[in-house]
Design a protein with these regions (language model features):
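C-terminal beta-signal and adjacent terminal beta-strands/loops
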Residues: 71-72, 121-129, 151-204
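A short, compositionally biased micro-patch
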Residues: 41, 111, 142, 152-154, ...
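Short, local alpha-helical segments
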Residues: 130-133, 142-146
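Ser/Thr- (and often Asn-) enriched beta-sheet segments in non-cytosolic proteins
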Residues: 60-62, 143, 158
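Gram-negative outer-membrane beta-barrel transporters
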Residues: 1-131
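Hydrophobic alpha-helical bundle architecture
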Residues: 135-137, 150-151
Length: 204
């Protein structure tokens, strides 16, 4: 802010007068012109989680559905004249991160005896980016599908194989991410990905 700016704001608008200390005579004793956090972020949302467990002849099944709805995301900045600049980021995308209204995950796991398997769907809602003033561009929704299966041997050895992003979904192009052309913090940077894991429990 600066001491003079604080004095001007107090005199002209009545703002920031609390930063000015006065003597009993009314003369200025001190102006609190130290580091001040003038920006703040307001976030509001709703998270929903539902789980269900099923015991059947075909095995044990578990289901989980979680969803997140972003209701409010405001970034407020105080300008030198004391006015406030507010940016509503719900449903928008920027150079470092996207803020979709909806995110959701569905997962089911199955096990019977030594066998197990799982399926997961990850949903990211659409957003709008503004690469240049007044130029609005929609970024589509993205859903990833992951599958995996495994087997546990009697000697403590376990094997598991899986595929993440089964449909080889590529991250949507983003014009606000000029260096790599997509949002690496929101979307999977790698396409279809195969993996295998072998573990051995020595306690068995």
């Amino acid at each position: 802010y600066g001491a003079q700016n604080l004095l001007d704001l107090c005199a002209s608008t009545g703002q920031r007068c609390g930063f000015i200390e006065r003597e009993s005579s009314g003369e200025i004793a001190n102006v609190a012109d130290g580091p001040i956090n003038l920006n703040n972020t307001k976030v509001e949302g709703v998270d929903i989680v539902a789980r269900y467990l099923l015991e059947a002849d075909s095995g044990t099944w578990s289901f989980m559905l979680s969803g997140a709805r972003l209701l409010d995301l405001e970034e407020r900045s105080t300008l030198p004249d004391g006015s406030e600049f507010v940016v509503d980021k719900v449903g928008t995308a920027a150079s470092r991160e996207a803020f979709p209204k909806w995110r959701a995950t569905f997962q089911t796991q199955w096990s019977k005896g030594a066998w197990s398997g799982s399926y997961k769907a990850r949903y990211i809602g659409d957003t709008v980016e503004e690469p240049s003033p007044g130029d609005f561009r929609k970024i589509r929704t993205v859903t990833y599908h992951d599958v995996a299966g495994g087997y546990d041997f009697d000697n403590g050895l376990s094997i598991r194989i899986g595929v993440d992003n089964v449909t080889d979904k590529q991250p949507p192009v983003s014009f606000t991410n000029l260096n790599i052309n997509f949002d690496i913090n929101t979307y999977d940077p790698v396409g279809r990905f195969f993996y295998g894991r072998l573990t051995w429990d020595l306690d068995l």
